[in-house]
Amino acid sequence: MPQQIELRNIALQAAQPLVHGVSLTLQRGRVLALVGGSGSGKSLTCAATLGILPAGVRQTAGEILADGKPVSPYALRGIKIATIMQNPRSAFNPLHTMHTHARETCLALGKPADDATLTAAIEAVGLENAARVLKLYPFEMSGGMLQRMMIAMAVLCESPFIIADEPTTDLDVVAQARILDLLESIMQKQAPGMLLVTHDMGVVARLADDVAVMSQGKIVEQGDVETLFNAPKHTVTRSLVSAHLALYGMELAS
């Protein structure tokens, strides 16, 4: 399994250019946070990595490398990169139980799909009574439960990398904290490389090792999390950090 995945000069276009020459490097055991405002190109960059661009959007330049060798996004999805989606309610088939979802995920990747394996993954993400959870349909579960189930399926993939696209969006404060605890636990136990897409600098401060800031389809600043919080350079980065510090009655040094 690869130890590093590199996005090199990725460019995306629809009716007009959307992402301009984005380069990112994911490393096993480290969390790279991709931050920026809505419409900055964060989720599109993730979609390009996985080969799931929306209709009408195409990649016009760039490549993806695994340990320095060019690789197709389709060869990465699921096997080498697991995904935690932004909206879990739309990610599950409403006609299938959690057992069907989890089992099909395992079978598609050639992983064990026995009930003991599925139960262990569900228990690992803190969902109680795994036997009952496996019988549930998506509409019978809360947003927080569905997000945990999605993380359980990422655990089942045993992929060396994870893309987590706004994993705490639309969750209440308690559910958000639990999801962050889970992601932190996964990093400690499995040490995958993680691309964490978020607009929440509190999430960045807690989980990230490195940060890349996007604005208008470009990476405008990139560095380790400590440097970025203590000495942000770009106006977009300074605005994000200042807004975060203001929540605690603090100000960014001029």
Curated annotation (Swiss-Prot):
Chief location of this protein within or outside the cell: membrane
UniProt-listed InterPro entries: AAA+_ATPase, ABC_Ni/Peptide_Import, ABC_transporter-like_ATP-bd, ABC_transporter-like_CS, Nickel_NikD, P-loop_NTPase
Source domain of life: Bacteria
SMART domains found in the cross-reference section: AAA
UniProt: ATP binding residues: 36-43
SUPFAM superfamilies with a match to the protein in the record: P-loop containing nucleoside triphosphate hydrolases (SSF52540)
Molecular-function GO term, any one: ATP hydrolysis activity
Location relative to the cell: Cell inner membrane
Pfam families registered for this protein in UniProt: ABC_tran (PF00005)
Protein name: Nickel import ATP-binding protein NikD
